[in-house]
Design a protein with these regions (language model features):
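Macrodomain-like recognition of ADP-ribose-binding/processing modules
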Residues: 2-147
Length: 147
């Protein structure tokens, strides 16, 4: 049996309308161990799809990410390459946003893409996700919503 996803107290506070609903309630849990059939684990990758660590490794081990596939839908996960520079990351996020728009039946759980080994901060990545964040089926980390 899979472990349950874990939300921090802060995430739960905002998800339940904390502080008059200043932040959206579409917040991902800090620790994702399982997904519903319509949920997709969105993770940062490299263009070569070498899923060695972090969320990429979780996607590979748990949610069907394919070794050697650095972008797009794979199993119950979606890879966004974040290691090839800011411009390429923005383009990949644009492609993800189009895909999310085309699939309103899916719930996209976007991890803190780019904020691990790629070296970006939430302040750098969150604005790139502004269009995706407007979609009702896209859920983001609280660190991105707070930017």
């Amino acid at each position: 049996m899979k472990k349950e996803n874990i939300y921090t107290d802060e995430e739960l506070y905002w998800m339940t309308g904390g502080d008059a609903g200043c932040l959206p309630t579409r917040i991902i849990p800090s620790e994702i161990y399982s997904l519903a059939p319509n949920e997709v684990f969105v993770f940062g990758s490299n263009a070569l799809g070498m899923h060695h660590g972090g969320a990429a490794r979780i996607a590979y081990n748990e949610f069907g990410a394919e070794w050697g596939n650095g972008e797009g839908m794979q199993g119950q996960s979606y890879a966004i390459p974040t290691m090839e520079g800011e411009h390429n990351t923005m383009l990949a996020i644009g492609r993800f946003t189009r895909y999310a728009k085309e699939h309103p039946e899916l719930k996209f759980m976007v991890t803190p893409i780019g904020c691990g080994i790629a070296g970006y901060t939430p302040e750098e990545i969150a604005p790139m996700l502004s269009e995706a964040a407007s979609l009702e089926n896209v859920y983001l980390p609280i660190s991105f919503w707070k930017v």
